[in-house]
Amino acid sequence: MLSRRHFIGAAAASLAVASGATAQDSCAIFTPERQKAITPEGAVQLLKDGNARFLAGKSINCDLLAQVRATASGQSPFAAIVGCIDSRVPPELVFDQRIGDVFAARVAGNFVNDDIIGSLEFATKLAGAKAIVVLGHTECGAIKGGVDGAKLGLLTKMLENFDPAVQAAKATGGTQSSKNKAFVQATADANVLLTVKKLTDRSEVLRELVAQKQLVIVAAMHDISTGTVKFFG
């Protein structure tokens, strides 16, 4: 007859084996077959699940060098993320993803222009990504600069990209100032939503993929004080 200690030890060993298998499966790279099998909605859910792991302190620990070797001959990311250059919002970390999982385009204030849109057309139509996430964040310095109309070299022209969002935020009332947190956040929210709209307005390629249900484009907001990512809609 097994002793209680033996039984507990055996159970723990079995659990460790099961957990190891799960972690190993989660570290598997995205192959063309895995990418093809996932739905656009499933791709978004993977990002939501990853953020939940990040918040719970249960990010998956993988052998990244092994993933470097495994992806050397090709890539099949399941999603593309348009994010800010802010050092506090690394998309692969906040969504608990690894090498070869996502495309990441980053620019101050997470806006898009033809260069970024063209990159997203590549990521989706040619490389097969099933979801695009426009990821903003709280306390965004670029958004604050747009709200105040800051002047500094080439930054001055870049900040004009946020003018439509600033105008949208004015409709909510409040003082237009970077010191007004509510106005800044209203601008950041409007910016990600307007950017989602711009992607399909500007790109026939993306518009057709969405119409064919091969792609979803969503807006999200990362709270830099908690790590939580809120998805809109």
What are these regions (language model features)?
Residues 87-88, 137-142:
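Gly/Ser/Thr-rich loops at beta-strand to alpha-helix junctions
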